[in-house]
Every structure is written in C-alpha cells, then in structure tokens.
C-alpha cells in the first residue's frame, strides 16, 4: 500500500490498527529497503492519527452519553 493513498474516513479503527501493527512488524523486521521503510513509516503516522481521531470521537460520545444518563430522571408510574 502506498502512502499516497488517502485514508478514507470509513476505514474502521480496527482496520487501521491492524494495518499499523503490520507496518510496525515490517519495519522491526529490518528487511525493507530504506525508501520502503520511510514510506511505511509515513503511512503509519497517518494511521496513528486516524486511530487517535477515532478514539477521541468514541471518548466524546461516551462522555455525552454518560452526562445524559446522569441528568435523566426516571419517573415511575404511581397507582391511583
């Protein structure tokens, strides 16, 4: 995969993380050429940023849900 490929917003966190892990393994292996390793590293940075964005979005959503749950009052029906 080339680093010129634009990371689409619809790539899932899990897909991005898996690709990032594969890149780390390839670089750690040390069998790639310098140019390929640099390109892989660049792609890894894009994937890392994407994962951080997805995590931030999830954290904000959880905070919003938690605040909503904390402020919701549940009224029980009473028998008359």
UniProtKB/Swiss-Prot annotation:
What does the record give as EC number? 3.1.11.6
Q: Is-annotated flag, keyword Membrane?
A: no
Subcellular localization(s) per the UniProt record: Cytoplasm
Where this protein primarily resides, as one coarse class? cytoplasm
The cross-references to InterPro entries, in alphabetical order and at most eight, read: Exonuc_VII_S, Exonuc_VII_ssu_sf
GO molecular function ontology, one term from the record: exodeoxyribonuclease VII activity
Q: Which reaction does it catalyse?
A: Exonucleolytic cleavage in either 5'- to 3'- or 3'- to 5'-direction to yield nucleoside 5'-phosphates
What is the main EC category here?
hydrolase
Assembly and partners are described as: Heterooligomer composed of large and small subunits.
Q: What is this protein called?
A: Exodeoxyribonuclease 7 small subunit
Organism, by scientific name, is Rickettsia canadensis (strain McKiel)
